[in-house]
Regions:
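Internal/C-terminal transmembrane anchor helices
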Residues: 72-94
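N-terminal Lys/Arg-rich, disordered targeting/topogenic segments
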Residues: 1-13, 41
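Beta-strand-turn-beta hairpins that frame and shape the catalytic cleft
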Residues: 101-110, 194-198, 208-253, 344, ...
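Active-site metal-binding loops of divalent metal-dependent hydrolases
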Residues: 114, 149, 231, 294-295, ...
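Membrane-embedded segments
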Residues: 93-219
Length: 372
């Protein structure tokens, strides 16, 4: 009986030692994700992959913190310090802001990836298309930026530009993937505005179906710049891999896993090139600027980090909760964002998770210019 009792503490000690041996590299790895995200000095695609794993590393650090609090409190200091050092990054994923009252009527900006507007499945989605069109036209916003917006001059249901112009007389449209469409149709980035657009320019990124659209808009006595962008899509479909695992088809699951890693690698490389162009536009802007769109990357990624060096993020400054924007697997991510320059103050930011017409949710930010 005594021997059995003596073995139990030994077993517990061995388990505790193994967990501690796991805690040490975990904390070092988490610190590495911080270093890469703080400095942004390493531009290799592997750095992008490491940065993307930051929230998971922080979660594991939190679990280890709880464990050590109840096992050996002194050891809990290490994960606690690591989490404290990364507190600023936690704010990228969760916010607790409340709407700010303003004497000035804020300018409302919507951004929404509209998923091609069901252009490839019109017969099955007629009702959904009409509901989507009414929503994007009737929602009360001053400026609306859409990604994957579709228009076709020979299909009445897709006379979407003229439909939107009923309430938004000013617009700019840059078609993307022109080689995939005939002369009567186009899909790409569009900005609709209640206020005059005095300048527009845009570009499809090299080797990509994505791009940016820059517009200069005159509101009252002020000229403002709005950039609508969509970065390279990673093309990740996690549900394919998880379904293979559920079916115990581990060979195909491994193939899907390798495909995900390959897509991430390509995406990080392309995002670096694309964000170099976007950042140059931001730096050269003579006007207060708002940048919106589909980053196809999480807040711990390189693209988010590099734009955040130059602009504030609307979710962090005025949002609440987690702000997840993806309406498909893996769901619990935020890849659609709005950013603004120092001349602006964000007074409210929302993700409209009740609007489910697309595989993304719309984001809506409200802004006032300082001194107004």
């Amino acid at each position: 009986m005594a021997k059995r009792n003596s073995k139990a503490p030994l077993k517990k000690k061995i388990i505790s030692s193994l967990i501690w041996l796991g805690t040490l590299p975990l904390c070092l790895y988490t610190l590495l994700t911080y270093l890469l995200s703080y400095s942004l000095i390493v531009e290799h695609w592997v750095a992008g992959f490491i940065m993307m794993t930051m929230p998971y590393a922080q979660l594991l650090c939190f679990i280890s913190l709880i464990y050590w609090i109840f096992q050996r409190a002194k050891r809990a200091l290490l994960p606690l310090i690591v989490l404290a050092l990364g507190y600023g990054f936690i704010g990228r994923s969760i916010s607790f802001n409340q709407p700010v009252a303003s004497l000035t009527k804020p300018m409302t900006v919507m951004s929404y990836n509209v998923f091609g507007m069901y252009s490839n499945e019109y017969e099955a989605k007629k009702e959904s298309l009409e509901e989507l069109k009414k929503f994007i036209r009737d929602y009360d916003a001053d400026i609306k930026c859409f990604q994957e917006f579709y228009s076709h001059s020979d299909r009445k249901a897709f006379h979407t530009v003229s439909f939107m112009k009923e309430k938004y007389p000013h617009y700019a449209f840059i078609p993307l993937k022109k080689q995939l469409f005939d002369s009567h149709e186009k899909m790409g980035l569009v900005v609709f505005s209640k206020y005059p657009i005095i300048h527009e320019e845009g570009e499809q990124f090299e080797n990509s179906a994505n791009g940016y659209l820059l517009t200069d808009i005159v509101k009252d006595q002020d000229t403002i710049r709005v950039i609508n962008m969509q970065l390279w899509s990673m093309g990740i479909r996690v549900n394919k891999m998880t379904s293979k695992i559920r079916l115990q088809d581990y060979t195909d699951a491994q193939k899907e896993g390798r495909g995900i890693i390959s897509s991430l690698r390509k995406g990080f490389i392309e995002h670096k090139k694309e964000m170099d162009k976007i950042n140059r536009l931001i730096q050269k802007s003579p006007y207060p600027i708002i940048v919106v769109g589909d980053l196809n990357e999480t807040p711990s990624g390189w693209a988010y980090g590099t734009i955040r060096e130059r602009l504030k993020n609307s979710f962090e400054e005025a949002g609440s909760g987690f702000g997840f924007t993806l309406n498909r697997s893996p769901y619990l991510v935020r890849i659609d964002d709005q950013f603004f320059s120092k001349e602006w103050k964000a007074v409210n930011f929302q993700t409209l998770r009740n609007i489910k017409y697309s595989d993304h949710f719309p984001t809506v930010g409200q802004y006032i210019l300082h001194g107004k």
